[in-house]
């Protein structure tokens, strides 16, 4: 009986390692990484909301894909897939309040944090919502996602 449980435990561990699941990350580390991601997403949202009306209205014409249902850290792959288009839109609409260097730094921070949170696994296939989102809706949705995951960890 014990052999069977041990073998099951080993098999499960191998599956987790094979799928690059973040096995060594403690809950506290995950919380800290989520806090960092939340901070960076909020900074982006604040930067977007501080644009003058013409630039903001131009940015709102770009549409982003959001997942149908994001409930787990693996769903961060969907955010990772939309980071490049997000970065390009932000570059197009830079302002004196939100410089290229700020955008690059925030996007780099987000990329690093996402990699830590979701692991290096990219086989997860995102199921996107049929409707696209504006840049502010997109950022708000991911902020809400992070807050939701964070609340389950506390």
UniProtKB/Swiss-Prot annotation:
Protein name as it appears in the record: Interleukin-2
Sites carrying sugar chains: 23
Keyword Secreted: yes
Annotated GO CC locations: extracellular space
Biological process, per Gene Ontology: adaptive immune response
Entry-linked Pfam families: IL2
Location(s) in or outside the cell: Secreted
Tree of life domain: Eukaryota
GO MF entries: cytokine activity; growth factor activity; interleukin-2 receptor binding
Xref: Gene3D superfamilies: 1.20.1250.10
Function: Cytokine produced by activated CD4-positive helper T-cells and to a lesser extend activated CD8-positive T-cells and natural killer (NK) cells that plays pivotal roles in the immune response and tolerance. Binds to a receptor complex composed of either the high-affinity trimeric IL-2R (IL2RA/CD25, IL2RB/CD122 and IL2RG/CD132) or the low-affinity dimeric IL-2R (IL2RB and IL2RG). Interaction with the receptor leads to oligomerization and conformation changes in the IL-2R subunits resulting in downstream signaling starting with phosphorylation of JAK1 and JAK3.
Disulfide linkage: 78-126
Main location: secreted
Family annotation (InterPro entries): 4_helix_cytokine-like_core, IL-2, IL-2_CS
Gene from which the chain derives: IL2
Leader sequence segment: 1-20
Keywords on record: Adaptive immunity, Cytokine, Disulfide bond, Glycoprotein, Growth factor, Immunity, Secreted, Signal
Recorded family membership: Belongs to the IL-2 family.
């Amino acid at each position: 009986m014990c052999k069977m449980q041990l073998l099951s435990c080993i098999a499960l561990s191998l599956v987790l390692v094979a799928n690059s699941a973040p096995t060594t990350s403690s809950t506290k580390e995950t919380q800290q990484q989520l806090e960092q991601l939340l901070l960076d997403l909020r900074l982006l949202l604040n930067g977007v909301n501080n644009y003058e009306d013409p630039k903001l209205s131009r940015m709102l014409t770009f549409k982003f894909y959001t997942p149908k249902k994001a409930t787990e850290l693996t769903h961060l792959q969907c955010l990772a897939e939309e980071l490049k288009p997000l970065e390009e839109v932000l570059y197009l609409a830079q302002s004196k309040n939100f410089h290229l260097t700020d955008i690059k730094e925030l996007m780099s921070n987000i990329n690093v944090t996402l990699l830590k949170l979701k692991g290096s696994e990219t086989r997860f296939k995102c199921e996107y919502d049929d409707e696209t989102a504006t840049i502010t809706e997109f950022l708000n949705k991911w902020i809400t996602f992070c807050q939701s995951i964070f609340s389950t960890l506390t």
